[in-house]
């Protein structure tokens, strides 16, 4: 999700983009523009390094807008340490707190506006927005300014799920979406 947010921010000329990534740094770096202040911070170096990396990338500017595409580990807490608490800052997250997917993160200061944004919204109250986005993404794909993540087709259809899960678990897959062709599953489509 983060790579899509980066592409939309770039398209809107929103800079600097300060991205936090791990093994996918090379992929993320290819989307950033250092001449506009964009930077990448490695989350594998720990929370203190993430906070300091964001501060360094800000170069004294205030952080007023943040999009947390993971809401994992301490990402919300790290953002709370760098987001400005006095000037109408906003954090958008893709997940609520653990155990309360649609809830509010209590660790975010009350002076900072928080909102949740996820795909479920387009199946309800945001259906019209979902339609517009789908058309806009299609246009971006056609024009080349919007790119999908790298995909890897897994051999054997659904029999390839185990291998894909192993790659995710051992960390050998990063910034990759796995594709399983159901028709390639042994026995698929046959009647018994």
What are these regions (language model features)?
Residues 1-192:
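Terminal helix/beta-alpha structural elements that buttress the NAD(P)+-binding lobe
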């Amino acid at each position: 999700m983060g790579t899509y947010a980066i592409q939309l921010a770039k398209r809107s000329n929103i800079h600097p983009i300060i991205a936090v990534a791990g093994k996918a740094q090379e992929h993320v770096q290819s989307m950033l523009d250092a001449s506009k202040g964009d930077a990448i911070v490695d989350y594998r170096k720990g929370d203190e390094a993430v906070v300091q990396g964001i501060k360094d990338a800000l170069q004294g500017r205030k952080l007023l807008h943040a999009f947390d595409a993971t809401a994992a580990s301490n990402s919300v807490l790290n953002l709370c340490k760098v987001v400005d608490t006095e000037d109408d800052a906003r954090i958008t997250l893709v997940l609520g707190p653990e155990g309360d997917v649609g809830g509010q993160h209590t660790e975010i200061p009350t002076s900072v506006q928080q909102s949740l944004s996820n795909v479920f919204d387009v199946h309800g109250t945001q259906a019209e927005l979902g339609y517009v986005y789908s058309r806009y993404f299609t246009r971006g794909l056609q024009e080349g300014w919007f790119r999908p993540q790298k995909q890897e087709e897994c051999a054997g259809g659904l029999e390839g799920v185990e291998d894909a899960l192993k790659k995710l678990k051992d960390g050998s897959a990063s910034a990759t979406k796995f594709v399983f062709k159901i028709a390639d599953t042994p026995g698929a489509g046959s009647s018994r």
